[in-house]
């Protein structure tokens, strides 16, 4: 993946407002790569410090991140992001639209 793609990912993620989330696929589409969700995931695994990484979730609102998933959920709860009863983010309520 080119560094310019990763920079584009980081630029978009930095714009997601507190209390909102975006999906990996949504970010990929914004960058003109509608099938680039995995590339967005790769970029997010290497994101710079200070980027609100917790605001990027799966399209269905599932939280990823292995051992970091509980940290991600806690950070989103602090931002008052709503969750469904099954533990997924309520994408209908808080999905960011640029």
Regions found by a protein language model. Give the residues of each.
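Nucleic acid-binding interface residues in structured DNA/RNA-binding domains
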Residues: 1-98
């Amino acid at each position: 993946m080119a560094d310019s793609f990763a920079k584009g990912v980081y630029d978009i993620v930095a714009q997601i407002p507190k209390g909102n989330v975006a999906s990996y696929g949504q970010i990929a589409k914004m960058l003109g790569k509608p099938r680039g969700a995995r590339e967005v995931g790769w970029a997010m695994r290497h994101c710079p410090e200070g980027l609100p990484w917790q605001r990027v979730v799966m399209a269905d609102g599932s939280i990823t991140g292995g051992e970091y998933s509980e940290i991600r959920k806690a950070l989103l709860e602090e931002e008052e992001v709503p969750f469904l009863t099954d533990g997924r983010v309520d994408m209908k309520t808080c999905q960011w639209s640029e």
